[in-house]
C-alpha cells in the first residue's frame, strides 16, 4: 500500500499577481480576451509544474477560476441569472465577469450577484441564484478543457469539482420562495455528464468537495446526500472531500455513501484518526489533511507523522493539505526582508507541497530523519524571545471582570456626553476614511521606498488631514474625522505599529475576483511600544472646535484579518491586542479626543462554523472589545462600526459590546436591518447607514430623509445618528462632497421638523 500525496488546490493569482493584472487590464479594455486566456494557461502550466517539482503525486485540476470557483460551478451548470445572459443564450468569460462585477467588456451592465464569505475564511464567493422551475445543462466546459491541458502536459490529474449538495446549500432563492434542495434532481444529470466525460479521458479519481458536511445541517439536507451520490457512483472513483472542521458528527451519513474515499481536515477538525479508521468502510481510501492549507506556519512533521503512523499499512492512505492552498501565499523563498529566524518558522504553498513530499516519503520508508530536520526550527520557536513577552503574559493573566466594565451604565454616560458635546438632534458624521487620492498613495509609497524623508512625508500627511477637516466644516458635519491619509489598510496600519506582528513583501492571497490581500502575521505576544494614532488625531482636533473622532480597528477584526499564531488560542491573541489598544484609548483621551471609534466589521464573520460553538467565541470576542474600550471615562463617547448584514442571531452580543453608538450598514437593505434592533429594544445610540458608499451614485436629499424617517419609526429619533454605510476611502471627492452635502441637508430638514 504505497502512500501518495496531493493538494486540494493551489493559489491561482501567480507569484506577482499576474492573474489580477491580466484581469484588470482586460476589464479596462487595455488587452484582448485572448491575451487574458493566455495568462491563465501559462499560470496553470506553471503551477502544475511547480507542485510536481515539489513532489506532489496527484495534481488538482479545476481549482483555477477566473473569478471564483463557485461561480465557475454555476456556469458549468448553466445557472446564469437572466440579467447577465447574452442575447443569443451563449455563455462566455464576459458572462462570468458580469455575474461577478456587474459589467464586462461586452454585454449590458446589470447588478452583480451577491458576494459572501467562503465558510469561515477571508475568501469570498459569488452566491448562486435559484428560481422556481429552473433548468440546468452543461454549458461551460472550463473543467474539461483544463483536464485536457494537464493531460497533454503529461500530468497525473485529479479533477476538482464542487459537490451538488454543497453547491445548493451555498445559494439563495430569488423571487417566489421554494426549497432550493428540490433542485437536486435537476442538477445531478449535469454532474453525471461531467463525470462521464472525465471517465472517457481515463481519469481514475475525482475530488468532489462537500464542505457542507462539516456543518450542523438540517436533517433534510443530510438525507439528500445518499440519493445524490447513488446517482453519481460508478463512472470514476470519488474522493468525498471535506474541510474547515471535523466530520465525526455527520459520519453516519458519510459512511452510507457509495464513494471510494474520504478527505478529512485533521488540522481544524477534532476527528480522531483511530476512530475514523475504525468507522470508515475498510475498502475506502482515507485522505489525511495534515498540512494546514490556510496558515503560513511550518509544520512540525514529527507530530504529523505520529498522528497518522498507526494506520499505515492498514488501509489505503493519502496525505494532503487540510484544504486548498488557495488561502496561503505562494512561495516563501522570494521573501528577502524577513529576519532569518522568523523566516525559518514559515511555509507558504510551495513549501507545504515539500512538507507533503517529506511526510509521504517518511511514511513509506519509516525513516523520519528528514522530518526531524525540517521540524527543528518550529520546535526551537517555542523558546524564542521573539515569541514570548513575560510582561504581556503577566498583564493578560491579571485581567479581572472590572477591566471589561465601563465605570457607569449607558444612561449615566449619555448624560455626561450630551453635556460635553452639545450635539444637535440627528447628529451627522462619517465612518472614518476619506478618498485615498493618487497624491496620498504616491506620498505613502515614496516614503516607504525611501524617496521622501520623514519631515516632508509628515508635512504632506498634515496637509491632507487639514484638507479633510476643511471639507467637513464646509459641509456642516457635526462630528469630524481626520480622514486616515496615513493608513494604507485598517489592519496593516495597526500591525505595523504593534510588536508581535511581521509583514511579507509578496504574501498575497486572493480575497475575491482580482482583489488580493497581504495579511499581517502574528508571530508572538502583542504589545504597543508607543502611541499609534494619537499624534494625527490631536493635530486634526487642533484645527477645529468640533469633536474629531479617534479611529481604531478593533481586536477581533485585527485577529480575523491576520494569519494567527497556532501555539496559543485566538482568544489569547484577541485579548493581547485589546490590552495594547486599551492603552491607545487612554492616550487619545488624555490628548483631548472625546469620541473614539473602535471598528469591528469582522465580529460576525469570525463566528465558528457550528452554531454550538458560537457562544464561547462571542463571549471572548465581546470581552476583548470591552477590555479595549472600558478604560474610557463617562464623558468619552465610544463608537463602533460594523458593515455586514445579519444581526438577528447575535443581537445579545452586539448589545453586550456596550458601545455608546453603533454605526451599521443598512442602506442596501432599505433599513430592514433595524428590525433586529427594534425587536431587541437596543438601548444605546445607532447610526444606520443612509447611503451605499460602494456605488458612485449620489443619493438625493429626499431619499435620505425618507430612509431616516423610516428609521425613526423603529428607533427613537433622539438615539439616531446620520452617516454613510462605510468608509469613503474608495470614492472620489466629487461624489463624496455631493453625497455628504445631501446627507447634511436631510438631517437639517429633519431638525426643522
Curated annotation (Swiss-Prot):
A single GO molecular function term of this UniProt record: 5-methyltetrahydropteroyltriglutamate-homocysteine S-methyltransferase activity
Keyword entries, A-Z: Amino-acid biosynthesis, Metal-binding, Methionine biosynthesis, Methyltransferase, Repeat, Transferase, Zinc
Example GO BP: methionine biosynthetic process
Gene3D superfamilies, A to Z: 3.20.20.210
Job of this protein: Catalyzes the transfer of a methyl group from 5-methyltetrahydrofolate to homocysteine resulting in methionine formation.
Similarity comment text for this entry: Belongs to the vitamin-B12 independent methionine synthase family.
The name this protein goes by in its record: 5-methyltetrahydropteroyltriglutamate--homocysteine methyltransferase
Organism encoding this protein: Escherichia coli O9:H4 (strain HS)
Native organism taxonomy: Bacteria, Pseudomonadati, Pseudomonadota, Gammaproteobacteria, Enterobacterales
Amino acid at each position: 500500500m504505497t502512500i501518495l500525496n496531493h493538494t486540494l488546490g493551489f493559489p491561482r493569482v501567480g507569484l506577482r499577481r499576474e492573474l489580477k493584472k491580466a484581469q484588470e487590464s482586460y476589464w479596462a479594455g487595455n488587452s484582448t480576451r485572448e491575451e487574458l486566456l493566455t495568462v491563465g494557461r501559462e499560470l496553470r502550466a506553471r503551477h502544475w509544474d511547480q507542485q510536481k517539482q515539489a513532489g506532489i503525486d496527484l495534481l488538482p485540476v479545476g481549482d483555477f477560476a477566473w473569478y471564483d470557483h463557485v461561480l465557475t460551478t454555476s456556469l458549468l451548470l448553466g445557472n446564469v441569472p437572466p440579467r447577465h445572459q447574452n442575447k443569443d443564450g451563449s455563455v462566455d468569460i464576459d458572462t462570468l465577469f458580469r455575474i461577478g462585477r456587474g459589467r464586462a467588456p461586452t454585454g449590458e451592465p446589470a447588478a452583480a450577484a451577491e458576494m459572501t464569505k467562503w465558510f469561515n475564511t477571508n475568501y469570498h464567493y459569488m452566491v448562486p441564484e435559484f428560481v422556481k422551475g429552473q433548468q440546468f445543462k452543461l454549458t461551460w466546459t472550463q473543467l474539461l478543457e483544463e483536464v485536457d491541458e494537464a493531460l497533454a502536459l503529461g500530468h497525473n490529474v485529479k479533477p476538482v469539482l464542487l459537490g451538488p449538495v454543497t453547491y445548493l446549500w451555498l445559494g439563495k432563492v430569488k423571487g417566489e420562495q421554494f426549497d432550493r434542495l428540490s433542485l437536486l434532481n435537476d442538477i445531478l444529470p449535469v454532474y453525471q455528464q461531467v463525470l462521464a466525460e472525465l471517465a472517457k479521458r481515463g481519469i481514475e479519481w475525482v475530488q468532489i468537495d462537500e464542505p457542507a458536511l462539516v456543518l450542523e445541517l438540517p436533517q433534510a439536507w443530510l438525507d439528500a446526500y445518499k440519493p445524490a451520490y447513488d446517482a453519481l457512483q460508478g463512472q470514476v472513483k470519488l474522493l468525498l472531500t471535506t474541510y474547515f472542521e471535523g466530520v465525526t458528527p455527520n459520519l453516519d451519513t458519510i459512511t452510507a455513501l457509495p464513494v471510494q474515499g474520504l478527505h478529512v481536515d485533521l488540522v481544524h477538525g477534532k476527528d480522531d484518526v483511530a476512530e475514523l479508521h475504525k468507522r470508515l468502510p475498510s475498502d475506502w481510501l482515507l485522505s489525511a489533511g495534515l498540512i494546514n492549507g490556510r496558515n503560513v506556519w511550518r509544520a512540525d512533521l514529527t507530530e504529523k507523522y505520529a498522528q497518522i503512523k498507526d494506520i499505515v499499512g492498514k488501509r489505503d492512505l493519502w496525505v494532503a493539505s487540510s484544504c486548498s492552498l488557495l488561502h496561503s501565499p505562494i512561495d516563501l523563498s522570494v521573501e528577502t526582508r524577513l529576519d532569518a529566524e522568523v523566516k525559518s518558522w514559515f511555509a507558504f504553498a510551495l513549501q507545504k507541497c515539500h512538507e507533503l513530499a517529506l511526510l509521504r516519503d517518511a511514511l513509506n520508508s519509516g525513516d523520519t530523519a528528514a522530518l526531524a530536520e525540517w521540524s527543528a526550527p518550529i520546535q526551537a520557536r517555542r523558546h524564542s524571545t521573539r515569541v514570548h513577552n513575560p510582561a504581556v503574559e503577566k498583564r493578560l493573566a491579571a485581567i479581572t471582570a472590572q477591566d471589561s466594565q465601563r465605570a457607569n451604565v449607558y444612561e449615566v454616560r449619555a448624560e455626561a456626553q450630551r453635556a460635553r458635546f452639545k450635539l444637535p438632534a440627528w447628529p451627522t458624521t462619517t465612518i472614518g476614511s476619506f478618498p485615498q487620492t493618487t497624491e496620498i498613495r504616491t506620498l505613502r509609497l515614496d516614503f516607504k521606498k525611501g524617496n521622501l524623508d520623514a519631515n516632508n512625508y509628515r508635512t504632506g500627511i498634515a496637509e491632507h488631514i487639514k484638507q479633510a477637516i476643511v471639507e467637513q466644516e464646509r459641509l456642516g458635519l457635526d462630528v469630524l474625522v481626520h480622514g486616515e491619509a496615513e493608513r494604507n489598510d485598517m489592519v496593516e496600519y495597526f500591525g505595523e505599529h504593534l510588536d508581535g506582528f511581521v509583514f511579507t513583501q509578496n504574501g498575497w492571497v486572493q480575497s475575491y475576483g482580482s482583489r488580493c490581500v497581504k495579511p499581517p502575521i502574528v508571530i508572538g505576544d502583542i504589545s504597543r511600544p508607543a502611541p499609534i494614532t494619537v499624534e494625527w488625531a490631536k493635530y486634526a482636533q487642533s484645527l477645529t472646535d468640533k469633536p474629531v473622532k479617534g479611529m481604531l480597528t478593533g481586536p477581533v477584526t485585527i485577529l480575523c484579518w491576520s494569519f494567527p499564531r497556532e501555539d496559543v488560542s485566538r482568544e489569547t491573541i484577541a485579548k493581547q491586542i485589546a490590552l495594547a489598544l486599551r492603552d491607545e484609548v487612554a492616550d487619545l483621551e488624555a490628548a483631548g479626543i472625546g469620541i473614539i471609534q473602535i471598528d469591528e466589521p469582522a465580529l460576525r464573520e469570525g463566528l465558528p462554523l457550528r452554531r454550538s460553538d458560537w457562544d464561547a467565541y462571542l463571549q471572548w470576542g465581546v470581552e476583548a472589545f470591552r477590555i479595549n474600550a472600558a478604560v474610557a471615562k463617562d464623558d468619552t463617547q465610544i463608537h463602533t462600526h460594523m458593515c455586514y448584514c445579519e444581526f438577528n442571531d447575535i443581537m445579545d452580543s452586539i448589545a453586550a459590546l456596550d458601545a455608546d453608538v453603533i454605526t451599521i450598514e443598512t442602506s442596501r437593505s432599505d433599513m430592514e436591518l433595524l428590525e433586529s434592533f427594534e425587536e431587541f429594544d437596543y438601548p444605546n445610540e445607532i447610526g444606520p447607514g443612509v447611503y451605499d458608499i460602494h456605488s458612485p451614485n449620489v443619493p438625493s436629499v429626499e431619499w435620505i430623509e425618507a430612509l431616516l424617517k423610516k428609521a425613526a419609526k423603529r428607533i427613537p429619533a433622539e438615539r439616531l445618528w446620520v452617516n454613510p454605510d462605510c468608509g469613503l476611502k474608495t470614492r472620489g471627492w466629487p461624489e463624496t462632497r455631493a453625497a455628504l452635502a445631501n446627507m447634511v441637508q436631510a438631517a437639517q430638514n429633519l431638525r426643522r421638523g
